[in-house]
Amino acid sequence: MGLKHLIEKLEPHFTHGGKLEKYYPLYEAAATIFYTPGQVTRGAAHVRDAIDLKRMMILVWFAVFPAMFWGMYNVGLQTIPALHKLYGAEQLQQAIANNWHYSVAQWLGVSFSADAGWLSMMTLGAVFFLPIYITVFIVGGFWEVLFAIVRKHEINEGFFVTSILFALIVPPTLPLWQAALGISFGVVIAKEIFGGTGRNFLNPALAGRAFLFFAYPAQISGDLVWTAADGFSGATPLSQWASGGGEALVNVATGVPVSWMDAFLGNIPGSIGEVSTLMIFIGGAIILFGRVASWRIVAGVMIGMIATATLFNVIGSDTNPMFAMPWYWHLVLGGFAFGMMFMATDPVSASFTDKGKWSYGVLIGVMCVLIRVVNPAYPEGMMLAILFANLFAPLFDYLVVQANIKRRKSRG
């Protein structure tokens, strides 16, 4: 019996009148993973295309894999030197025994020696990342299924993307219960309350992170959360620049200065998926060439960031080192690159019109640099910049449409 035949045989049990009718969203979600939906458009007008919502979301899901795998490797790369800086040999073994992440990693064969190989670093990073991702996926999926069953509609595949994006923009040390709480806020409050996928005006992953930032700032920001070594305090390069300028950039664990290439490749502490600009650009190219993301938004964000950073460079300041940060450093530090490629380009919460996309992107770039430079308490500005632009996206589209209407009336 083939898989397709099995799926077709089970379908009557889940359709109207079947014993499992109320669970049809679960059946439909599983069936359309393997095969395209059987329904076709019968009336005019419609578009024939090789991609549907599920496959579009899966493309984005795969596109973040380069940043995800590098992020896991980087967690180990930052953690092992930090552990050796904190502990001697005997103390390190005690620390491993007292931390379940380290214990699981050691059981999996991870070497905690100073010369540990890339596989040990990757495995250690996976031990921190995968529990966060699995927690977020299960909790987010639960809410998606619950709302689909109650509303009697198909399960929206957006949670595939929302879950992995959320897991990649948080620190590796985030408690699992906070990960569950954050994704619950993002899915329920920022998306499902407004009608689900396609109707939300805020990016759910960013909304969930913003909730954690304001509700539990100690676990989502500061100097203690970016390196997964118990008791280790190390600021991100963005925070270091904010306090001491470019000369202050140094890897706290190794004592080695941080170069621009280190930041571009991702050899710095930070949120799991935001550290490597190179890997983010590789994934971003996939969704840009796949036409899932809009190049106009990406270009607008870059233009807004470069113009605003250059303006602050020209103005200068004797008391605020952030005024002197060049645009190419803004690009590789913090969550700018990840936000530009995967958050700002969210087709639901971004502007729809071409001109609106330019305005939307420029606003994000301007606001990100403005928050980073002018706000001394919050050196990272990409999250708030995108959420702020989400609120203005409908206005940009409205103004573009009204301008088109006026132009057509003037012709006639």
Swiss-Prot record:
Its EC number is 7.2.1.1. PANTHER family: ELECTRON TRANSPORT COMPLEX PROTEIN RNFD, NA(+)-TRANSLOCATING NADH-QUINONE REDUCTASE SUBUNIT B. NQR complex catalyzes the reduction of ubiquinone-1 to ubiquinol by two successive reactions, coupled with the transport of Na(+) ions from the cytoplasm to the periplasm. NqrA to NqrE are probably involved in the second step, the conversion of ubisemiquinone to ubiquinol. It is found in: Cell inner membrane. It comes from the Bacteria. It comes from Klebsiella pneumoniae subsp. pneumoniae (strain ATCC 700721 / MGH 78578). Its cofactor is FMN. Keywords: Cell inner membrane, Cell membrane, Flavoprotein, FMN, Ion transport, Membrane, NAD, Phosphoprotein, Sodium, Sodium transport, Translocase, Transmembrane, Transmembrane helix, Transport, Ubiquinone. This is Na(+)-translocating NADH-quinone reductase subunit B. One of its GO terms (cellular component) is plasma membrane. The chain crosses the membrane at residues 57-77, 127-147, 163-183, 270-290, 297-317, 322-342, 358-378, 381-401. GO terms for biological process: respiratory electron transport chain; sodium ion transport; transmembrane transport. The modification FMN phosphoryl threonine is found at residue 236. The keyword Nucleotide-binding does not apply. GO terms for molecular function: FMN binding; oxidoreductase activity, acting on NAD(P)H, quinone or similar compound as acceptor. Pfam families: NQR2_RnfD_RnfE. InterPro entries: NqrB, NqrB/RnfD. The lineage of its organism: Bacteria, Pseudomonadati, Pseudomonadota, Gammaproteobacteria, Enterobacterales. Its main location: membrane. Composed of six subunits; NqrA, NqrB, NqrC, NqrD, NqrE and NqrF. It catalyses: a ubiquinone + n Na(+)(in) + NADH + H(+) = a ubiquinol + n Na(+)(out) + NAD(+). Belongs to the NqrB/RnfD family. Coiled coil: none annotated.
